């Protein structure tokens, strides 16, 4: 009987212990994601796209407040409408990851800024902080943009990590007047639950594998020196009212729709939540290209007609599912 009890205790305690060790070991990788280099092939892909759309591209260098060098492109269409959209890619990606978004925005007359996030692509920076430092990076990008361009309105669009960054950036900098965010994380703790639950069973990350969540976040906070609890798009949208179009992919197992639903519930400004049927993580544009373009362009057009700084007074938007 005692032997059975010992075996039961071992079986009960082994998974949490293993999770704690795994979380501790995974911490550095969370801050130092795999870097997708900006290869010559990717540059040629972008150049071909810009040639087809008849746009002009120039290199854009911005120094962040911590002196990290951020690299990207400023791209203008043939007939610019005077509005600019800042595009933000996902984790372990680079600026070419949002090329598809840039194409339809440029065709619609929007100029775009495509930057490699810190610790991604060709940009500098010792680590990714998922919005903590990236918020001030975004403000530096806007400062540099406004020093050479006269923007009627500045909007932002991001996916995954980039979605979380744009939501936190817009809360910190009112020059960003409206945001489209696909597959954002609600906060780092919720994202860690999904990570610890093997991106399929978040309840495991909150129960049996909870020690993995705790050790991962604790080690990252010590390594990076910022409060992980404050890296929260959910808190950001509650701190400042601004228009937001949230897009979540129905079959997303990396950042399930509950993240976008939490952000939607917290948002104080005009808001819309679009659940894209059958779509996987950050795949809404691929699954429903026409509807994606229609919704995003309609959203930005609604706020392009407002006087600068007056977008929060526009009508509130609704929650939706699928096409309409």
Task: Describe the residue ranges of each PLM region.
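Hydrolase active-site cap/lid region
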Residues: 169-226, 235
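Short beta-strand/loop motif that positions the catalytic acidic residue
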Residues: 239-241, 246-248, 252
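The serine-hydrolase catalytic nucleophile loop
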Residues: 91-104, 117
């Amino acid at each position: 009987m005692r032997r059975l009890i010992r075996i039961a205790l071992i079986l009960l305690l082994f998974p949490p212990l293993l999770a704690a060790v795994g979380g501790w070991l995974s911490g550095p990788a969370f801050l130092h994601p795999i870097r997708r280099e900006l290869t010559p092939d990717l540059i040629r892909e972008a150049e071909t796209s810009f040639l087809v759309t008849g746009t002009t591209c120039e290199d854009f260098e911005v120094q962040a407040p911590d002196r990290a060098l951020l690299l990207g492109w400023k791209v203008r269409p043939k007939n610019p409408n005077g509005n600019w959209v800042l595009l933000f890619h996902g984790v372990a990606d680079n600026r070419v990851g949002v090329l598809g978004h840039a194409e339809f925005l440029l065709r619609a007359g929007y100029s775009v800024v495509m930057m490699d996030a810190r610790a991604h692509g060709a940009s500098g920076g010792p680590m990714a902080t998922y919005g903590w430092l990236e918020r001030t990076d975004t403000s530096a990008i806007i400062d540099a943009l406004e020093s050479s361009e006269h923007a009627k309105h500045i909007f932002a669009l991001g996916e995954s990590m980039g979605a979380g960054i744009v939501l936190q950036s817009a809360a910190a900098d009112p020059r960003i007047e409206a945001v489209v965010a696909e597959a954002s994380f609600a906060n780092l703790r919720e994202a860690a639950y999904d990570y610890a639950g093997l991106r399929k069973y978040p309840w495991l990350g909150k129960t049996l594998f909870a020690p993995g969540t705790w050790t991962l976040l604790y080690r990252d906070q010590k390594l990076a020196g910022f409060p992980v609890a404050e890296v929260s798009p959910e808190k950001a949208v509650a701190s400042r009212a601004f228009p937001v179009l949230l897009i979540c992919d129905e079959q997303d197992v990396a950042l399930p729709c509950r993240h976008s639903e939490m952000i939607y519930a917290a948002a104080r400004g005009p808001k819309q939540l679009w659940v894209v049927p059958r779509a996987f993580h950050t795949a809404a544009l691929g699954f429903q290209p026409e509807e994606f373009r229609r919704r995003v362009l309609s959203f930005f057009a609604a706020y392009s007609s407002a006087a600068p700084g007056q977008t929060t007074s526009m009508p509130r938007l609704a929650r939706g599912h699928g096409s309409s």
